[in-house]
Amino acid sequence: MAAAANLEDVPSMDLMNELLRRMKCSSKPDKRLILVGPPGSGKGTQSPIIKDEYCLCHLATGDMLRAAVAAKTPLGVKAKEAMDKGELVSDDLVVGIIDEAMKKPSCQKGFILDGFPRTVVQAQKLDEMLEKKGTKVDKVLNFAIDDSILEERITGRWIHPSSGRSYHTKFAPPKVPGVDDVTGEPLIQRKDDTAEVLKSRLEAFHKQTEPVIDYYSKKALVANLHAEKPPKEVTAEVQKVLS
């Protein structure tokens, strides 16, 4: 059992702000969301807004896998064994790590799943896990956008590594070029944010993930967003869909 957090050294203002945040969140409806869309479609821009607005936890499977491996949890140990052998981590392991993450207090009002499921089999396994918990996916937000628009978006993208905040030299520039607005720390460009890598990733997306959209469409859960619009207009669409 994890040791209880020592709150005595936490500044009173921080405690009050967190208490007020939780009181505000208590009146929000529970939501379990999946974000689907090709790289550069705006998921990374919208997910923090959705997370804060609806008091959800953001579950990025890649980050969770790395955290589980680093923490040497039972599932993390199994995942590391697969990685060390050069194997893909099994769908059951990933779903298990999502299951564990959902037990955190920050996930009590629901979650945003980003980067999973990527295949219909993964979607089915996720549904089975949620059904055992007496819950289900409420909405799948499909960030629909034409491939031709994505190259300009991708090659101009800059990231703040520790927070995940994303910027764009043309569409959403930081106040100071190359610097995060909040912390003042330097921004980076991902190594795979190139036209060549984008083409490969789009081919994989269309082949693997579009059947997932069809799977959830048959359950009447998919909301198609006009992801080519400016971020504020996409945010307004999201709010309308989730209201």
From Swiss-Prot:
One of its GO terms (molecular function) is adenylate kinase activity. ATP binds at G40, S41, G42, K43, G44, T45, R157. The gene is ADK-B. It comes from the Eukaryota. Residues 156-193 are annotated as: LID. This is Adenylate kinase 4. It comes from Oryza sativa subsp. japonica (Rice). Belongs to the adenylate kinase family. Keywords: ATP-binding, Cytoplasm, Kinase, Nucleotide-binding, Transferase.
